[in-house]
Amino acid sequence: MTEFAHRIAVDWHRTLDQVLERARAAGPKGLVIFDLDSTVFDNLPRQARIVREYGQQKHLKALETCQPFHFTSGWDLTGALVALGLPPEEAKGHQQELKRFWGARFFTSDYCRDDIEIVGAPRYLHEVVKTKARIVYVTGRHEGMREGTVACLAKCRMVLPGEGAQLLMKPKEVQDDDAFKRTAHTLLADLGTVLAAFDNEPMHVNDYALRFTDALAVHLATDHSGRPVKLQDAVVSVPHFAY
């Protein structure tokens, strides 16, 4: 998001190289942590599909043309409706019903298959595996989304669970994302040495920086849930993985 553009250094890619250097030095005992949504996956195609289907149900032709570029933020559904041509007041009138429609679909195995890769992510993930360090995906997605998530990892040619990576998911959808990720910190410490952690959510990447003080905490300046959280000074922001 543009609010973090000022944090992205001209030589931001050096942080990614530094992670690989640490991974090569650590080998199999080293862990590199990645969130999924808006970190290695772009979920805007999923968001756009949901708006199109809502438009079909409501017979709103303008919404049936929704594409990822209609979103300025993946979480701003009302803004997408306005971008599609609905007057602001009419868009606001759909807010609650659309949110319910969205909630019944977004966090499902079927819909998450529509995600695509953040640019450069597949190549970078495979570069991490080449170092012999291990990847752990730590996501706020719940176990009911595992099948679709693994299918999407395969579609995007990313490192799969059991092939150099491990996938940690919330046991239940209702569990709070923040609490789950903090609980995962203990498991990560038991699995190995956390060398770096990548996450798009300021709250979550801050938690990694505070919990694993010797690790590189890397913020993906892509999209986030919109909570007004200031990034820790130790956190480095990058735009994507392509360099």
Where are these regions (language model features)?
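C-terminal cap/substrate-recognition subdomain and adjoining C-terminal extension
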Residues: T2-E3, Y124-R134, H142-Y243
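Alpha-helical substrate-recognition element adjacent to the catalytic core
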Residues: T2-V10, R14-D17, E21-L31, D37-C156, ...
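The start of beta-strands in P-loop NTPase/AAA+ ATPase cores
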Residues: G30-V32, V194-L195
